[in-house]
């Protein structure tokens, strides 16, 4: 959930939802601490330095750039945004695979792209206001899932991927010629290969657990992480 995430009440609501639904493979509280540290760093940015924000063509980073710009709305710094997906496709001729996330690029690639964008001007006030307003719209939504589709952030029902998960497990059963249990991590790997969208693996794992609890999938193991249990169709 993103509702009112720029306020303490929204942060608390998101923390509670993640704690109840998502199996992050890290210590409890790590995400909350990282988020709090990031918010503090944004707040402490001094006013006399330019700010560069990198983002790629996925829902996480497209939402993130709008969220950060909203948090920085009172700052007078020059703001620069760099779409790493567009720049990678434009300048990295020898690319071996598509880039879904900025974090997939190594430092040398980022350096090249930064140099290529040095002459680009800062965001205009109009563009900043537009992106800040888009964040406000997102923060008023009750959607639990958003995807990047047709160059837009689109809210989807929480069960959006459920039928695809079921179809993928059925496909694996047919390919293996058996209905034996399949490791959940393997299922998620297959899902990511077939999806034309960048999807958070922990959200997919949450939906698999939902399909177990609703009686559509059978479980073997303890679902404390995607590596620790297997599933099959009932």
PLM segments and residue spans:
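Long, hydrophobic/aromatic-enriched structural stretches that serve as scaffold segments
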Residues: 22-67
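A short, conserved structural fragment
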Residues: 212-223
């Amino acid at each position: 959930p993103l509702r009112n995430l720029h306020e303490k009440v929204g942060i608390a609501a998101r923390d509670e939802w993640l704690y109840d639904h998502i199996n992050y493979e890290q210590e409890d509280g790590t995400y909350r601490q990282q988020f709090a540290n990031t918010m503090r760093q944004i707040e402490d940015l001094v006013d006399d330095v330019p700010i560069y924000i990198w983002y790629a063509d996925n829902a996480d980073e497209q939402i993130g750039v709008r969220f950060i710009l909203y948090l920085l709305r009172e700052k007078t710094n020059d703001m620069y945004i760099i779409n790493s997906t567009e720049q990678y496709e434009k300048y990295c001729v020898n690319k071996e695979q598509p880039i879904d996330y900025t974090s997939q690029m190594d430092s040398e690639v980022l350096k090249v792209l930064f140099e290529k964008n040095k002459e680009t001007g800062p965001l205009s006030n109009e563009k900043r206001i537009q992106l800040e307003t888009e964040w406000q719209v997102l923060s008023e939504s009750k959607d639990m899932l958003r995807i990047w589709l047709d160059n837009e952030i689109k809210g989807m029902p929480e069960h959006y991927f459920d039928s695809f998960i079921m179809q993928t497990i059925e496909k694996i059963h047919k390919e293996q010629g058996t209905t034996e249990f399949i490791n959940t991590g393997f299922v998620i790997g297959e899902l990511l290969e077939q999806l034309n969208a960048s999807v958070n693996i922990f959200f997919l794992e949450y939906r698999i657990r939902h399909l177990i609890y609703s009686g559509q999938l059978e479980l073997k193991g303890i679902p404390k992480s995607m590596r620790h249990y297997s599933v099959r169709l009932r």
